[in-house]
Structures are given as C-alpha cells and as structure tokens.
Amino acid sequence: MERLLIVNADDFGLSKGQNYGIIEACRNGIVTSTTALVNGQAIDHAVQLSRDEPSLAIGMHFVLTMGKPLTAMPGLTRDGVLGKWIWQLAEEDALPLEEITQELASQYLRFIELFGRKPTHLDSHHHVHMFPQIFPIVARFAAEQGIALRADRQMAFDLPVNLRTTQGFSSAFYGEEISESLFLQVLDDAGHRGDRSLEVMCHPAFIDNTIRQSAYCFPRLTELDVLTSASLKGAIAQRGYRLGSYRDV
C-alpha cells in the first residue's frame, strides 16, 4: 500500500532568503507544504510568493518565542517581545495559558486575513505547541477549526477524536550532518515502525542577513541542495511513498 509523505518547510515568512528557499524547494524539489509565521518580518513577501505557487500547501507556524505577539501578552513578553524564556516559565508551570489561547486565535485570524483561506494545519516555532500545558489548547483549537495538527504520537498525548494528523512525524532531518542518505534513513525508520503517513520537517533557505544571525544557518542551504536533488524523488517513490500534504490526511 502506498504511504503518504509530507515534506513541510518551517519558517515561511522568517526572511526573504527563507521564503525563496522554500519556494525553490517546492518548485524544483520535494517540499509539498510549509508553515508560515504570521508575525515574521517577511510574511508579506511570503504571501506574495505563494500566489505564484498554488501547489504549495500552507499551514500556520504558531509563534510564542520570537518577535512581537498580536495580542497583549504581559505574562509572556519582555519589553513587548516574545523569547525563549518560555521554557523557564513552562518548567515553573507559570505559562499564561489564557493569553496563549487568545494569541493562538489572533494568529489564526491573521493567517486567514493574509492568505485568504484557512491554514492546512498547525504546528509551532520551536515546537512549543508540544509543551504538555499548551498541547491541549492547540489540539482543541485545531479540532474545532477542522484543520490538521503536527503531533508527535510518541508524546502519548490524548488527541481529540476528530483531530487529523499523520501517523508519524520526524524532526531528524536537521543538524550539521544533512545528507540525502539521512533523509532516506528517516523514511526507512518510519517504514519499520509501520507508519502509513509521515511528516518530515525541514528548513531549506538561501542565506541572507537574517539567516546569518540564526544558530541554524548554513545547514539550511545544505537542506535546500538535498531537497532539490535530482535523485531524491525517485528514491522516495521506490520506498513506496507518495508526496502530498495535510490536505490528504
């Protein structure tokens, strides 16, 4: 039986270099899906590029760790800006869950305003939606809106009955050792688990000033090279995978 493979590029809207990399990986590679940061500095550029690439499925990359929120979040911001101190708040069980709930709804409405349609699915920047305190909020919201959600089933969360997600999710195509063999190993591992549907996360980009400031910089360019490799699409098909998006889940 044919298996579904979703290759999702995170960070659409982060920068122009990121946006161009994602479009290139869709147009000339195997990326089928992306998730957009509605508060990203290059989100308007991302919207513009997406109009010329209708085959690219676009979901929402919920942001709680970067930039300015769309709502007042005094319990999570410092000087009006979001940051990685959210991990400390989570450890202290001090997350402002009502503020997070309101921000999620606001980012969702902003996505629809920008792209003119609902996102195909939800995930989050730095995987914050997988925090045990936050996941029930996001899962319930996705189910209510009728959209899919990136979920790591190994986390063993209780999922809403009507929530759509893939059987498998992998973030292993990441780091300093990016290669075609690594990507194919991710598929083989999922096959051994018996996953009938799989999302693989990626971050293809061209380098610009914003990406240069990221702790994860040059591997994004290597990812782009691998994801547009002439041989990769054939190797994926040989393993019994069909490229698709969360529309197919």
UniProtKB/Swiss-Prot annotation:
Gene Ontology process terms (BP): chitin catabolic process; diacetylchitobiose catabolic process; polysaccharide catabolic process
UniProt cross-references to Gene3D superfamilies, sorted A to Z: Glycoside hydrolase/deacetylase
Purpose of the protein: Involved in the degradation of chitin. ChbG is essential for growth on the acetylated chitooligosaccharides chitobiose and chitotriose but is dispensable for growth on cellobiose and chitosan dimer, the deacetylated form of chitobiose. Deacetylation of chitobiose-6-P and chitotriose-6-P is necessary for both the activation of the chb promoter by the regulatory protein ChbR and the hydrolysis of phosphorylated beta-glucosides by the phospho-beta-glucosidase ChbF.
Family statement drawn from the similarity comment of this UniProt entry: Belongs to the YdjC deacetylase family. ChbG subfamily.
Recorded GO CC terms: cytoplasm
Organism: Escherichia coli O9:H4 (strain HS)
Cellular localization per UniProt: Cytoplasm
Enzyme class of the recorded protein, top EC level: hydrolase
The protein's name: Chitooligosaccharide deacetylase
Keyword terms: Carbohydrate metabolism, Chitin degradation, Cytoplasm, Hydrolase, Magnesium, Metal-binding, Polysaccharide degradation
Annotated pathway: Glycan degradation; chitin degradation
Named cofactor requirement(s): Mg(2+)
Positions bound to Mg(2+): 61, 125
One Pfam family matching this protein: YdjC
Predominant location: cytoplasm
EC number(s) stated in the UniProt entry for this protein: 3.5.1.105
Catalytic activity: N,N'-diacetylchitobiose + H2O = N-acetyl-beta-D-glucosaminyl-(1->4)-D-glucosamine + acetate; diacetylchitobiose-6'-phosphate + H2O = N'-monoacetylchitobiose-6'-phosphate + acetate
GO molecular function terms listed in the Swiss-Prot or TrEMBL record: chitin disaccharide deacetylase activity; deacetylase activity; metal ion binding
High-level lineage: Bacteria, Pseudomonadati, Pseudomonadota, Gammaproteobacteria, Enterobacterales
